[in-house]
UniProtKB/Swiss-Prot annotation:
InterPro entries: D-isomer_DH_CS1, ThiF/MoeB/HesA, ThiF_NAD_FAD-bd, Ubiquitin-activating_enz. Gene3D superfamilies: NAD(P)-binding Rossmann-like Domain (3.40.50.720). ATP binds at G96, D117, K140, N163, N196. The keyword Metal-binding applies. Signal peptide: none annotated. The gene is uba-5. This is Ubiquitin-like modifier-activating enzyme 5. Interacts with ufc-1. GO terms for cellular component: cytoplasm; cytosol. It comes from Caenorhabditis briggsae. The keyword Zinc applies. GO terms for biological process: protein ufmylation; response to endoplasmic reticulum stress. It comes from the Eukaryota. The active site is at C262.
Length: 432
């Protein structure tokens, strides 16, 4: 092959490569934009729509996003709603439940949110709430932050895009629990919204180690039931005190998954569980109502069981056992105060009315009514007074009319005559 033939072959190859590249570029441009995975830089939003609000106001105007929240204070539900701006909450798992929880807390005006997740937004997530199709390809924590700063720019949002179950990341997670608050101290609450037991055990271990109160949540694989649980180390059962079968059997969850098979998911169930979790969070942070220790949800029967689970003295988590001993010592050292008051016999007060109706005790003897007509209301009187019928205790107390007395005497005479006739017949029979 001559040199000219080689050059011609190379030129032909280059030409075909250029044509192939042109075809690929054409097909790329024809692909719907929703299927493209946008880069993080493409999805960065513009600046927040308003300036930060320094102090909450109850003024009812269209431009005040806090007026309806502050109404809780005016109605006596919450004593000081503004203290929510001093609270820091960590949300572990920003998926179907966690993303809605983060949004609700942001709308409620929480001071700071710390988000933990390592997953990315996918088109398959669109059957759930919060995320948008144009956020596909972004990390969930970044997409959540980009959305939440527009919902409420007053909330400080910190994100961590990693898996907390690895050793190094677990240490960072514990560090943020210890020093992640607005004042660089311990945070107020941890919310677990993860979808696997390994991550739940990691959160449980960290919170037991730091003596951190947290709340756990979950939705069943068939998407028609869920639960939330309040966990206070030492006082209530931790996640390891009553472990599910998968954890108790030391089964690796990853071995249970099958290719092409996924769990069911309904935005309705996730929204209900997220609502319960945030409501319990608000009651705990703002100190109103009753914080539920466990609330279940069965969508098929609209059943909401509530339970209170005590800690397991034989829990496998050593930090849980330590917290149990600390709690028992705390309870035993507190003085027992008995607030016993003698019952007072208070008279029953009945509401006055315009009809002269009075409620009296059943043992009270009614006074005889006067001959004068009773005034029922101003200008209204009875046409006549009802007669009182005497009580009939026995036949001796009966007062008979003259005709009744004659009839009674006549009946007694007949009875005596019949008795006498019967006596005479018996005597005659004896003689015979």
């Amino acid at each position: 092959m001559t040199e000219s033939d080689v050059a011609e072959s190379i030129g032909d190859i280059v030409s075909r490569l250029n044509n192939a590249l042109d075809d690929l570029e054409t097909k790329k441009n024809q692909t719907p934009s929703v299927l493209k995975g946008p880069t993080v830089s493409q999805e960065r939003p513009s600046a927040p729509y308003r300036q930060k609000i320094e102090k909450l106001s109850a003024e009812v105007v269209d431009s005040n996003p806090y007026s309806r929240l502050m109404a809780l204070q005016r109605m006596g539900i919450v004593r000081d709603y503004e203290q929510i701006r001093d609270k820091t909450v960590a949300v572990v798992g920003v998926g179907g439940v966690g993303s809605v929880v983060a949004e609700m807390l942001t709308r409620c005006g929480i001071g700071k949110l710390i988000l933990f997740d390592y997953d990315k937004v996918e088109i398959a997530n669109m059957n759930r709430l919060f995320y948008q199709p144009n956020q596909a390809g972004l990390s969930k924590v970044e997409a959540a932050r980009d959305t939440l700063i527009h919902v409420n720019p007053d909330v400080q949002i910190e994100v961590h895009n990693f898996n907390i179950t690895t050793m190094d990341n677990f240490d960072v997670f514990v560090g943020r629990i210890r020093n992640g608050s607005l004042k660089s101290g311990k945070i107020d609450l941890v919310l677990s919204c993860v979808d696997n037991f390994e991550a739940r055990m990691a959160v449980n271990m960290a919170c037991n180690e730091e003596n951190q109160i947290w709340m756990e949540s979950g939705v069943s694989e068939n998407a028609v039931s869920g639960h939330i649980q309040y966990i206070e180390p030492g006082k209530t059962a931790c996640f390891a005190c009553v472990p599910p079968l998968v954890v108790a059997s030391n089964i690796d969850e990853r071995t249970l998954k099958r290719e092409g098979v996924c769990a069911a998911s309904l935005p309705t169930t996730m929204a209900v569980v997220a609502g319960f979790l945030v409501m319990n969070t608000l009651k705990y942070l703002l100190n109103f109502g009753e914080v539920s220790h466990y609330v279940g949800y069965n969508a098929l029967a609209d059943f909401f069981p509530r339970e209170s689970i005590k800690p397991n003295p034989s829990c496998d988590d050593r930090h849980c056992q330590i917290r149990q001993k600390e709690y028992e010592e705390k309870i035993s050292s507190e003085p027992i105060t008995l607030d016993i008051q003698a019952p007072e016999d208070e008279p029953i007060i009945h509401e006055e009315n315009d009809w002269g109706i009075e409620v009296v005790d059943s043992d009270t003897t009614e006074a005889p009514s006067s001959s004068a007509a009773t005034e029922v209301a101003p200008g209204l009187k009875f046409a006549y007074e009802p007669t009182q019928t005497p009580k009939k205790n026995s036949s001796d107390n009966l007062k008979l009319s003259p005709s009744q007395a004659v009839t009674k005497e006549w009946m007694e005479n007949i009875r005596d005559a019949l008795l006498e006739e019967d006596r005479l017949k018996k005597e005659q029979n004896k003689r015979k």
